[in-house]
């Protein structure tokens, strides 16, 4: 799978709050095609947050499949994620999808990849954090620093971390979208 350009999706958990944020930039090769895309959404009647990096059409297909898995497994996020990853890895058509997902509920934050990975990041002092996309390393570093050395709420940690990622990563802009639990 080739690296994805054109997005940063960040998920932060602190004090019982979960915030998922994304930038709005869509890049095709070396051209910015759109600056206000929504890459995060609510699933399972608002109980789950999901964000994507990669091909948009592929991500929407994966959102649909993931929502079905959530229904099949009584909204168990880890179980639904593992079942989607198994299907994604073994189905010939799904294997060609080029996207990554971050999914979260109040207890779990997971990253799903087309390689069949389901990763739950280690907790960090003050909460939990994960990001995908080209600006992920910058957003994670900033969020971890803020979680460990400030009392900012989850939403503000996500906002400041995404602003920093937008300043550094040329494939990430500052038109931010947030979803919260």
Curated annotation (Swiss-Prot):
Any one GO cellular component localisation term in the record: HslUV protease complex
Activity regulation info: Allosterically activated by HslU binding.
Pfam families to which the protein is assigned, alphabetical: Proteasome
E.C. number(s) listed in UniProt: 3.4.25.2
Assembly mode: A double ring-shaped homohexamer of HslV is capped on each side by a ring-shaped HslU homohexamer. The assembly of the HslU/HslV complex is dependent on binding of ATP.
Descriptive protein name: ATP-dependent protease subunit HslV
Record has Cell inner membrane as a keyword: no
PANTHER family, per the entry: ATP-DEPENDENT PROTEASE SUBUNIT HSLV, METALLOPROTEASE TLDD
Active site residues of this protein: 7
Alphabetic keyword roster: Allosteric enzyme, Cytoplasm, Hydrolase, Metal-binding, Protease, Sodium, Threonine protease
Single GO biological process annotation from the record: proteolysis involved in protein catabolic process
Similarity comment text for this entry: Belongs to the peptidase T1B family. HslV subfamily.
Reported function: Protease subunit of a proteasome-like degradation complex believed to be a general protein degrading machinery.
Superkingdom of origin organism: Bacteria
Enzyme class: hydrolase
Reactions that this protein is recorded to catalyse: ATP-dependent cleavage of peptide bonds with broad specificity
């Amino acid at each position: 799978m080739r690296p994805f350009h054109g997005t940063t999706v960040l998920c932060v958990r602190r004090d019982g709050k979960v915030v998922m944020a994304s930038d709005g930039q869509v890049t095709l090769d070396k051209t910015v095609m759109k600056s206000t895309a929504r890459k995060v959404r609510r699933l399972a009647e608002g109980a789950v947050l999901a964000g994507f990096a990669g091909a948009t059409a592929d991500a929407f297909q994966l959102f649909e499949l993931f929502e079905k898995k959530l229904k099949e497994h009584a909204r168990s996020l880890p179980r639904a994620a593992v079942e989607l990853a198994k299907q994604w890895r073994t189905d010939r058509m799904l294997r060609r999808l080029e996207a990554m997902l971050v999914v979260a509920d109040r207890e779990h934050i997971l990253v799903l990849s087309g390689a069949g990975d389901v990763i739950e990041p280690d907790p960090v002092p003050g909460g939990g954090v994960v990001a995908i996309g080209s600006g992920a390393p910058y957003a994670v570093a900033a969020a971890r620093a803020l979680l460990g050395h400030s009392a900012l709420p989850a939403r503000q940690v996500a906002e400041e971390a995404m602003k920093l990622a937008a300043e550094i990563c040329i494939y990430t802009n500052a038109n931010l979208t947030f979803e919260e639990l």
